[in-house]
């Protein structure tokens, strides 16, 4: 398919990316419809995928996506966690409609529900995991593009892109390459200039690891203004002396009127007379506690 034009040929950089992400490594099972896309079988029983056919099918899928006038009518689906971030990035760059996560049954067939949609093209991450949207697409005649491994069933799949769809780096790389080819065919980016978007943006990231990376980020310390240095003979001068508050004269401060407390009453003088003595008093008739009077009742 791409053999006629050298511009559309598979470049060495793309082959290096395929090999690094292990896109060519399949599974130990082989479906009879995927046999045409396999290159050979290793000694351990794992089938290897022909990367040239992978590239040709990738270009065919990009042409089918570009042929849709309204980009929102292209639906990208991934129920696997490894492909959800790549699907969202693909939709943000191409304008497609993403469905990341669980697919609601009846989205393409049940017109009563609020999530009903009528896309013109469907792109799925794995026909095994996303069997529900693929089956519903066959009911309403929606063409399906799928990333297929060696054990995938091609029933109801119109364009199969052979690749390793079980590795997180491989599936992220395939979505990145599909996005790049769509933008190139639309004329959004130039084919001769490398795309400035890194492929790492399409890779899956564990939420726990992302939180740990955010927590381990070093917070930049605030710059502290250094105080000016003075020689020993000038200690005490400078900003420190200027900041000292002015001391007021407490003797000249205004007196606050206040009410003085009343003086305490003088204590009574102690008694000087002897209680036991029977002497004569100087002030009046002497009376003792035990003395009898003239009209004494005891006489």
From Swiss-Prot:
GO terms for biological process: ribosomal small subunit assembly; translation. One of its GO terms (cellular component) is cytosolic small ribosomal subunit. Keywords: Cytoplasm, Ribonucleoprotein, Ribosomal protein. CDD domains: RPS2. It is found in: Cytoplasm. Residues 275-285 have a biased composition (Polar residues). The keyword Thylakoid does not apply. The keyword Ribosomal protein applies. Pfam families: 40S_SA_C, Ribosomal_S2. Residues 210-299 are annotated as: Disordered. One of its GO terms (molecular function) is structural constituent of ribosome. Belongs to the universal ribosomal protein uS2 family. Required for the assembly and/or stability of the 40S ribosomal subunit. Required for the processing of the 20S rRNA-precursor to mature 18S rRNA in a late step of the maturation of 40S ribosomal subunits. Component of the small ribosomal subunit. Mature ribosomes consist of a small (40S) and a large (60S) subunit. The 40S subunit contains about 33 different proteins and 1 molecule of RNA (18S). The 60S subunit contains about 49 different proteins and 3 molecules of RNA (28S, 5.8S and 5S). Interacts with ribosomal protein S21. This is Small ribosomal subunit protein uS2.
């Amino acid at each position: 398919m791409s053999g006629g034009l050298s511009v559309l040929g598979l470049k060495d950089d793309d082959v290096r990316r395929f090999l690094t992400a292990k896109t060519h490594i399949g599974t130990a099972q082989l479906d009879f419809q995927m046999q045409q896309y396999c290159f050979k079988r290793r000694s351990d029983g794992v089938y290897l995928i022909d990367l040239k056919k992978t590239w040709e099918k990738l270009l065919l899928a990009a042409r089918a996506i570009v042929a849709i006038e309204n980009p929102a009518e292209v639906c990208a689906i991934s129920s696997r966690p490894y492909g959800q971030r790549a699907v969202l990035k693909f939709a943000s760059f191409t304008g497609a409609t993403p469905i990341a996560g669980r697919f609601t049954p009846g989205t393409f067939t049940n017109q009563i529900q609020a999530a009903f949609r009528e896309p013109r093209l469907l792109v799925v991450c794995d026909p095994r995991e996303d069997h529900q949207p693929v089956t519903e697409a066959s009911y309403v005649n929606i063409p399906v593009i799928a990333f297929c491994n060696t054990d995938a069933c091609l029933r109801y799949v119109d364009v199969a892109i052979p690749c390793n769809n079980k590795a997180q780096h491989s599936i992220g790389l395939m979505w990145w390459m599909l996005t790049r080819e769509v933008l190139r065919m639309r004329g959004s980016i130039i084919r001769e200039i490398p795309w400035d978007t890194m492929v790492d943006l399409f890779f899956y990231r564990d939420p726990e690891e992302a939180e740990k990376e955010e927590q381990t980020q070093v917070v930049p310390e605030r710059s502290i203004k250094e105080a000016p240095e003075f020689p020993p003979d000038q200690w005490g001068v400078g900003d420190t002396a200027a900041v000292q508050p002015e001391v007021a004269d407490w003797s000249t401060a205004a007196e606050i009127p206040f009410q003085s407390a009343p003086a305490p009453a003088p204590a009574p003088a102690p008694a000087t007379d002897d209680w036991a003595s029977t002497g004569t008093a100087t002030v009046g008739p002497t009376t003792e506690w035990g003395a009898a009077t003239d009209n004494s009742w005891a006489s």
